[in-house]
Amino acid sequence: ASRGLGDVYKRQDKDIIKSTITSTDDGNGNYTNPVIFADVPDIDIIRVDDAFYMVSTTMHLSPGCPVMKSYDLVNWEIVNYVFDTLEDRDNLALRNGENNYGKGQWATTLRYNNGVYYAGFTSFSTGRTYIYHTDDIGNGKWDRFVYDECFHDMSLLFDDDGKVYLIYGGGQIWCIELEKDLSAVKPGTKRKLINDAGLVKGCLAEGSHVYKLNGYYYIFIITWPPHGRRTQLCYRSKALDGKWEMKVIIDDNMGFRNDGAAQGGIVDDKDGNWYCFVFQDHGAVGRTPVLSTMTWEDGWLVVGVDGKVPKTAKIPFAGHEKKSVVTSDEFINSQIVRSYHSFADTPEEAGESDYNGSNLGLEWQWNHNPDNRLWSLTERKGYLRLRTGDVCGTVANARNTLTQRTFGPECGA
């Protein structure tokens, strides 16, 4: 039988025991890939002191761009979101027959520099690029800079000389320089770094993640060859405008159909060990993250053993509490008011985006921007109250539809 949230949550003294259903911590010091058995695509990851932070794509959902935290790279929990409402437009709010499916927030780059966290992404729904920043990633408040142009699958680079770059593109990999405070793009700084990236494998590449390590610039990038599988490549050069070498980093389906594990970030620990976090398509569950160690060979970071991602491995830092990105299906009005903020520029109707005193758990997301006048956790304690708004023809067009991630290997409502 399929497993639903009701099967794994039990009430004791009116408290909810948090589930660990998306954790693959085996309880014996090992973990099993996928390391999070739930939809967490387009991941980027950083470490600050002993804590690891990760962001992911949530497209049309609201709030958007979840911030996840872990101390062992295996047990992750959602601690915040980057934004509540990206903007107030008809396509972002399921208004007037418009929608944002398959668009919205994509492939966020996450970086930490001089005490500030940065989360940046392009949205083809608005034709804009957003650079959010905060000094408290777990609680916000996030502020942002907005550029009125798109930089596909971009990656932030804080260089050793204090310059700041965006590396981006599909096939043609470009570079632009930003102002040092990231408030704007420096005019006249656009230049091409790599021509026809990934074409040697039969398909142009995208999904850049850029790093400066040991005197080299490394760009990790993904390609998807015809009749092949998603493959992780790495380009390196001693200068941004220099000659770029290429190496295949991962070409592995991990025994699951022909779905290759690729696209994501790398991170080190305090002892100098390196890890990669990429994702693999897992059907209806979505895009599930996989974790592998990395080792240096001839100036390249090599994944796992002979370029293969392990099915099971030791937890890098054992002994931490199990955590999950799916934690409850209860409608408890949280006492914690998260301080990610709405940037709705021109609300269609007063009150639609206003705070209504209800705080859903971080595992919940709305399908598109909600109408906050039409839902409540305060009118009846422990329950979600939904009120009808507009009449629509299909559930896909219904506002205030509440969602959670599916999880594997089985789940049900």
Feature annotation, model-predicted:
Residues 385-412:
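Secreted extracellular polysaccharide-interacting domains
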Residues 35, 41, 46-61, 68, ...:
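Hydrophobic core segments of beta-strands in well-ordered, beta-rich domains
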